[in-house]
């Protein structure tokens, strides 16, 4: 950085890599000027966030050094954030962009070349030109001579401001020279290099605080003029890279936005407005120009164009500090977007059956959902402090509702008058929240203190508070959630090998916003066992503000068959289980809603009744036949502490669990850690350790009674799921496909050793294991495959004894296919310990590739309430 050809000292920011302090050699007095120059070079990355390139289409945004704003509150150095926009100083921009001659450039400000404007207008009328240029971006540019490569576009920039203007030291034409000529083709060449035909375009604009430009040789151009109420005529441009039936009306949409905002807020001060379609974008505003992604329909495109063009008033002209006060741009802008839709689309769209079950004001519903869970944030929250969801729901949505409430309180006519005065008084001056409040109060004649206080509070915006009616609804309904508690119903089905198909009904009140009392009941009639089964849960759900995020008190229950037989009379008999599980969970509150960590502690008591078979020998054929046995009851107390970090990189969870039953205890710890690979995919690592012991002396009776609870290394089968927490197709099967279902618990070695009890690594002392599974390298396959490599290794107490049945460490490795977001996993063991190989050879009937396969079906991991909330 230089001033008057003298190099300036700089200081790196201690935290932000993209912020630097430039130390002037002499102080800059109020009202004085200085010119700072610097060369800079930018390599546009593949498009991400707001800019970059997609093939040979370029989106140059946030691409040059900008001076921080110095206002009454001091300096505002700001790093680039994907969530959180900008606060920049006004100035006069004079920018020249050099590109290959066939490129169309859309940019902030007024294009100075009449010849280039005429060339673009010719593209509007030349249908053949449109068709040729709607082809893929891989078309080669027109060269004066053949060339394998073209240089990157050169983009000098000059910004004049009373603070710290910037310009490039290279290739900056003097204004008089630049304005005396239209844009002309030039020849860019280096010694021994291929010559490329280029052109240099100049754009100028005053009273703006940013500059963006977009270049694409496929751009189709539309153009019109807009006559404002004052009689001033401005230009309206639209650029899109292919024939698009939606975008053929984009100029008309931009004109409507200019007219609408100018009438309600104040006249648009610039002489040009442009909209650009870019593939990798949602919508992003810059002074006089906005880029918009591909939209699903014309109405959505119109709404997005109006929203982004509308930013010119609040982001562009008023230019509040939207990094600290995003509501002053995004929220107020969204309010006017709602008014635009009501004005232009007064007829209500016919809603389909599912849409009819939610309220028309979905913004209000979203605010209520997060407020009920105590996960909302005040409107006044800074951009960087918002969660991703709240940034959209609160900064945009709730603010628009708050503005509507102000309009209703003040009256629309007076409200519009106040907003026009606010605009006229503060345009190009960076108003603060207190300035906005002062203007609204002084010109409305009302004390709005209470209303503006709501900017700093949490909670829903309610139009009704009172008793609610109870109404039935098929599937679900949230249509009138403020006035009605819905009891929802829908058909239910189930299947296992003993009950066969089950049909029934789900009754629930799981909804959004969540209820304090929640229930879900699913009675089922089993066509096989001819009995009523089912599952259900009743619970209370609290969201205190302090200490805990949630407190959940619940009781769940279930009843199903787990075995089937035929008695001596040829009649089918069934055995099964029922359980009742009271639970109390405390989910700890994080200091910040931005935290990705979830911590909870939970107590459960399993009260389980099981009915098996007694076997009676028939004297006629000397065959033992099953008869229904008596119900045997057992219990299990369980205390669990869990911590999970859902961060994008290296997420993990860890769980410590203590269990106690009749005469025994079991303590275990399980951890998962995901190592992300730089090029996508990653490795999941699981660690497990368990300690088992007896309450009192170890006796043969206790050993037998607690055998089911003892940890083991190899795959856990259905009849070893002692809490009945997993879904099994055939819980008690020992052959067939159903017998190959396992669950991920204990050591997790994915090899079934049903015939070899001594090889299962079971212990009434301790067990430890590590499990790994990794995605395949991305560069090996053209598409992502749901195939992984797994490897398991473990040890247990008895393996360290003298004359142990197995080696100290057992291992299994192979391929894993994961489907439906890991709900269904299929495991194919290929390499495994010598003990496994030798023993499997003695049982050829199970030692085939197909019989060694196993699978897990982890439907128990689904949480209906959490799915709905997300």
Tell what function each PLM region has.
Residues 1-56, 175, 182, 186-189, ...:
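A surface-exposed beta-strand-loop module
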Residues 67-75, 83-126, 138-306, 335:
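Hydrophobic helix-coil surface modules that form long, contiguous segments used
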Residues 428-431, 492-505, 510-516, 521-534, ...:
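Solvent-exposed loop/turn segments connecting transmembrane beta-strands
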Residues 449-547, 592-596, 614-650, 753-766, ...:
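Outer-membrane beta-barrel initiation region
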Residues 20, 167-168, 174-176, 203, ...:
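Hydrophobic alpha-helical and helix-loop surface patches within well-folded domains
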Residues 491-493, 533-535, 539, 550-573, ...:
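C-terminal outer-membrane beta-barrel translocator/porin domains of Gram-negative envelope proteins
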Residues 817, 821-822, 846-870:
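Outer-membrane beta-barrel "beta-signal"
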Residues 40, 491-495, 505, 521-525, ...:
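Transmembrane beta-barrel strands of outer-membrane/channel proteins
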